[in-house]
Structures are given as structure tokens and as C-alpha cells.
Regions:
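Predominantly soluble domains enriched in secretory-pathway, periplasmic, or organellar proteins
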Residues: 1-248
Length: 248
């Protein structure tokens, strides 16, 4: 269904590879207008509008950019992911990755997009052209309890996405490095002799076991820990992504 929903307005390579207006491309504001479902591109030097266009319904207020500043990705609350070419002021592709979406994140290299969904309970990985690569049905490590995804963010130095789960006391880290080491699945008797089950490290989750639920979080400066809290818990926690558990 995700693949069938994909709309290509402008194929890759069909638009000019240079900006079509005069402005500092790295000094622009993207203004998401919540009331009337439009987006305005604002010149950061002159504080004047450059372009305004209609958006999908109820965009999330945090659009995500590719490293070169050319593309920006929007997520709507009803699951649509839109890719906008700032240089050409065009929506180039769209796909519906969920029914009730929390937010989206773009990888540090601009090649992947992760989408956090409340409905269905899923974490969707897309390529930069919005083709689905991996759809994770989100369940606990025992495969029993499903969960909504509260948020997903990019940990650029780790080459990974990190997601908080609403209904399971886990945080997931998903590497977008094709050379990521394999992930042990279950009990491992001997890592050296590979006695146990392993899954590919690329685009699969490593689970951190938590003391409480996470609704939202932020990274420490070295990106080795996340700090966050649940809305109902009344206290925060620190999760070490290498130790893969709560440490405080």
C-alpha cells in the first residue's frame, strides 16, 4: 500500500541542478502554516517571502533537510511524506507511510528517511526518493506487545536513527550504515565463534531496555546517550545506546 501510494511529480534529474532564484540557499526559513495548510519559503537575509505553496493536511512542525540544503521533507499527521526541492520550488515526490504519523527523520547523508507512526504500529524506512525499504512492525523483544512510535531522530555521528516507543519500555537504534555489524538475536554463547543467531545490522533495530516509557528525548553532545521522559512518569531517564539500557 505504501508503494502504491507513491506519487512522483518530477522524476530525479528532470529539474535543474542549480537554484532558480537569488538568495543564500543556506539561510532560508521554512514556515509551516498550521491554520491554512501552506508552507512559505522565507529569505533569511531580507525576511521576505520567496515562495508559498499548499501542503498536505496538518504538517508536523519540524521539516527535515538534506545536508546540501537542496531538499526538505515534510510529514503530515495523516501519514504523507513530501519531498520538496528548494532550489526549484517544487514538490518532487510524495508517499503515504502511515495513517497517524508522529514525525520523520532524515539520515545524516540524506539517503534515508525514517517515519514514526502511531497507526499502524510501525517504523518505516524509505530511501531519498520515498521508496519503501523496510517496514518494521513494532513489537517488544518477545514479539507479544505492539507499540506506537513516539518519535524518531537522527544520531548522525552514529549513522543511525533512534526511536522512542510509546507502549513498550524500549528504545530502538537502527543503523543506516550498510557496513553495520550484525546484531545478536537472543542469547549468544560465543561471539567469536558465532554460536547463536544474528540478524543484519543494516536497517534492523538494536533494542535498549528501559526503566520507563519514552515519549520524547534528546541526545547528549557525543550522541552516546539519550535523555527523555514519558508524559505520565514524572521523572526522566538516561539511556546509554552502547550499553543498551537505562543508566540513570
Amino acid at each position: 500500500e505504501i508503494r502504491a501510494s507513491r506519487i512522483v511529480h518530477h522524476a530525479p534529474g528532470s529539474l535543474p541542478d542549480k537554484p532558480q532564484f537569488a538568495a543564500d540557499m543556506m539561510n532560508l526559513f521554512i514556515v509551516v502554516e498550521g491554520g491554512d495548510h501552506h508552507v512559505t519559503i522565507l529569505d533569511g537575509d531580507k525576511l521576505e517571502p520567496i515562495h508559498r505553496f499548499p501542503s498536505r493536511y496538518a504538517l508536523h512542525g519540524g521539516p527535515k533537510f538534506t545536508p546540501d540544503g537542496r531538499y526538505v521533507f515534510f510529514a503530515s499527521r495523516d501519514g504523507w511524506i513530501s519531498k520538496f526541492d528548494i532550489w526549484n520550488l517544487k514538490v518532487v515526490a510524495e508517499v503515504r507511510a502511515g495513517i497517524n504519523t508522529r514525525n520523520a527523520a532524515v539520515s545524516g547523508d540524506g539517503k534515508y528517511v525514517a517515519v514514526a507512526n502511531y497507526l499502524p504500529h510501525s517504523l518505516v524506512i524509505l530511501d531519498a526518493e520515498l521508496n519503501p525499504l523496510k517496514i518494521h512492525a513494532v513489537r517488544d523483544r518477545f514479539g507479544k506487545q505492539s507499540s506506537r512510535v513516539s518519535a524518531v531522530y537522527t544520531a548522525e555521528p552514529r549513522r543511525s536513527f533512534v526511536a522512542a516507543l510509546k507502549d513498550v519500555m524500549e528504545a530502538w537504534e537502527i543503523s543506516y550504515d550498510p557496513k553495520a555489524p550484525e546484531i545478536p538475536a537472543g542469547m549468544i554463547h560465543d561471539f567469536q565463534y558465532r554460536e547463536g543467531a544474528f540478524i543484519p545490522g543494516f536497517l534492523n533495530p538494536k533494542r535498549s531496555i528501559l526503566d520507563d516509557y519514552l515519549d520524547d528525548f534528546f541526545f547528549t553532545q557525543d550522541y552516546n546517550e539519550v535523555m527523555g521522559a514519558s508524559r505520565e512518569g514524572g521523572k526522566g531517564q538516561v539511556v546509554h545506546l552502547d550499553v543498551r539500557r537505562s543508566i540513570a
